[in-house]
């Protein structure tokens, strides 16, 4: 419900807030590296026996044989279980090495995260007018590393008796939000989804401190979820929104009241994102690209009503309402720009469109939101007899 001011005449200042820590609940109990590898070997043995094709289980990293052989380093071409691999020819990103590990990808991605909320309010008023003002700050660090959501919000709700027969007021809210666009759906792009697809024997980092991943042969096609989050930490999405209504109410005659109400909802969004290369990914390193997107949209609703309210002989009550309502929506635009192949993808100072390659992959696009309008007339009649029987017509 909307908070309103009081008629006490004394201003009332309030504060409400909390600070806490949040953590994800129970996670899936997954196999460690050796159990996962032994299970994979057992599955291959069963497949060989069922198909009666002979041979032994194999993996590019762990060789071929009755049991997997653990190499001293995983390699991009496949270590074949060798324990004498020399990593001195390390050359990122084409020739990399990483030790056999027991990585719990969930634990690497998950964290205890702070959440806080602070709100101050000021309310008061007299018979001539009331007010309720508030300001709020909310910050939630995500349980996924390098993720967050923050919001600044102010509200104003006022009403004034200008004359005995005239009243005006408003109820307006402004909010600014910012986050880094963390995916919350159930698709494979969800960070937690990657934690169950990643091979546990691959570490987060290789021997040189660069991100490790599925480019090590025989480890699947997963993307390193920690790498994805770190690379996306400077991306952000902002939204400015103003919404609320202004109203006025006038008593034309003793039993006849006119009310007008104008509501508006304006939103401006801005999207700022660098999609970086993924050198440790098995499918493709990809091209980096930087995209900026800006859009705005607003809608308004204007409602006018006449209300006749009359009581006859203390037992007959009649209320007649007539009104109009007009709506406009889709009053906005969207602009998108994108360019590829940035030389310094980690330097946010270079994240501007004209620093990218001006080739045929560039994107410059604008969209029209699709304006539409509605207008309606409505009416309602309510009659009650002795506060026992009610009849309504619309």
Roles of regions detected by a PLM:
Residues 128-131, 165-168, 255-258, 316, ...:
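Repeated loop/turn-to-beta-strand initiation elements of outer-membrane beta-barrel proteins
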Residues 17, 135-141, 391-394:
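Transmembrane beta-strand segments that form the barrel wall of outer-membrane beta-barrel proteins
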Residues 115, 126-127, 163, 251-253, ...:
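Outer-membrane beta-barrel channels and translocator barrels
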Residues 261, 374, 378-384, 391:
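Exposed, low-structure sequence patches enriched in small/polar residues
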Residues 108-112, 122-126:
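Outer-membrane beta-barrel initiation region
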Residues 1-14, 115-117, 130, 136-138:
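A beta-strand signature from Gram-negative outer-membrane beta-barrel systems
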């Amino acid at each position: 419900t909307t908070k309103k001011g009081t008629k006490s005449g004394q201003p009332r200042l309030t504060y409400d807030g909390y600070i806490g820590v949040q953590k994800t609940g129970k996670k899936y109990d997954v196999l460690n590296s050796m159990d996962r590898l032994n299970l994979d070997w057992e599955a291959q043995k069963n497949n060989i026996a069922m198909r009666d094709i002979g041979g032994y289980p194999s993996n590019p990293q762990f060789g071929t044989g009755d049991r997997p052989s653990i190499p001293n380093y995983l390699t991009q071409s496949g270590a074949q279980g060798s324990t004498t691999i020399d990593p001195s020819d390390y050359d990122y990103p084409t020739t990399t090495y990483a030790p056999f590990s027991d990585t719990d990808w969930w634990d690497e991605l998950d964290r205890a995260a702070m959440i806080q909320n602070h709100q101050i309010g000021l309310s008061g008023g007299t018979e001539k007018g009331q007010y309720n003002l508030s300001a709020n700050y909310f910050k939630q660090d995500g349980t996924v590393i390098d993720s967050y959501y923050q919001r600044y919000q102010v509200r104003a709700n006022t009403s004034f008796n200008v004359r005995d027969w005239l009243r005006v007021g408003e109820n307006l809210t402004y909010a600014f939000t910012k986050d880094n666009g963390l995916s919350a759906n159930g698709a494979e792009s969800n960070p937690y989804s990657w934690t169950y697809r990643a091979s546990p024997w691959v570490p987060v980092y290789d021997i040189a401190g660069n991100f490790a991943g599925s480019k090590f042969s025989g480890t699947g096609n997963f993307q390193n979820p920690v790498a994805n989050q770190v690379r996306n930490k400077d991306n952000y999405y902002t939204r400015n929104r103003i919404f609320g209504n202004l109203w006025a109410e006038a008593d034309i005659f003793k039993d006849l009241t006119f009310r007008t109400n104008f509501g508006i909802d304006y939103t401006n969004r801005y999207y700022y994102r660098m999609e970086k290369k993924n050198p440790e990914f098995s499918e493709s390193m990809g091209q980096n690209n930087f995209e900026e997107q800006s859009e705005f949209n607003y809608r308004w609703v204007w409602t006018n009503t006449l209300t006749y309210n009359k009581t006859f002989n203390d037992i007959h009550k009649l209320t007649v309402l007539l009104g109009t309502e007009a709506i406009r929506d889709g009053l906005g635009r969207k602009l998108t720009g994108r360019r590829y192949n940035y030389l310094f993808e980690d330097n946010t100072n270079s994240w501007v469109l004209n620093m990218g390659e001006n080739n045929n992959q560039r994107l410059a696009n604008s969209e029209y939101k699709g304006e539409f309008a509605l207008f309606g007339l409505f009416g309602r009649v309510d009659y009650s007899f002795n506060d026992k029987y009610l009849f309504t017509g619309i």
